[in-house]
Amino acid sequence: SMTIYDNKGWVVVNNSHVIFAIDLNTFKEVGRIENLTSPRYIHFLSDEKAYVTQLWDNRIFIINPKKYEITGYIQVPDMTMESGSTEQMVQYGKYVYCNCWSYQNRIIKIDTETDQVVDELKVGIQPTSLVMDKYNKMWTVTDGGYEGSPYGYEAPSLYRIDAETFTVEKQFKFKLGDWPSEVQLNGDRDKLYWINKAIWSMDVTASHVPVRPFLEYSGTIYYGLTVNPANGEVYIADAIDYQQQGMIYRYSPEGKLIDEFYVGIIPGAFCWK
């Protein structure tokens, strides 16, 4: 993943156990943080403090971005190193919320003053995304695991969670065998998008998921999704077959194709400057 902070791009490379800080104009490295386990996402609390989630580790790392140093750890309860999985983070007041994905079923709540997990909320099997809308409602979608999984297999769901009370307000259920992922918000944070073979969209105040998708499934592999925060245009990454160059499609907010272009192999994430 990549996050922009302090006029730098922070590129989190999980397989290389490192975070690179790069110049946004030249893409040249200006610093790095090493000795991470398998970093996934970074969330900045201040110029001198950030959290880094991990795969295959039961700790969230605390780092000092100015010094490019690891300064501490947050131990996640009831999680082993082998089953460790923390992912995306959102913040409400002094609390940071994080979804626990691989062989997990929880959203955890972290007090940023004490760097301790103070609460957790159980959802379905393997919550894959976490975003916060304009009404301070968190959204996560579960993938339901897979058939034969030792952790279980169930129909996935989309959840709306109130950040103030840390309770589930609404659960939107999918069919067994569906594989929803990549929950995103538009710039106004009042419209939700996600992938479930097709591309789907709905208002954050909706009472049910739509019957028709925003974009129909075309037999390809939609692998990444983002929405331009300035104009609402939707960008979709197509992995095609995981072997050749991927394709990016750009659509208007009304679902009309504007542009398409090739990128590298398996495009999966976007970052807006």
Q: Could you describe each region identified by the protein language model?
A:
Residues 1-273:
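Predominantly soluble domains enriched in secretory-pathway, periplasmic, or organellar proteins
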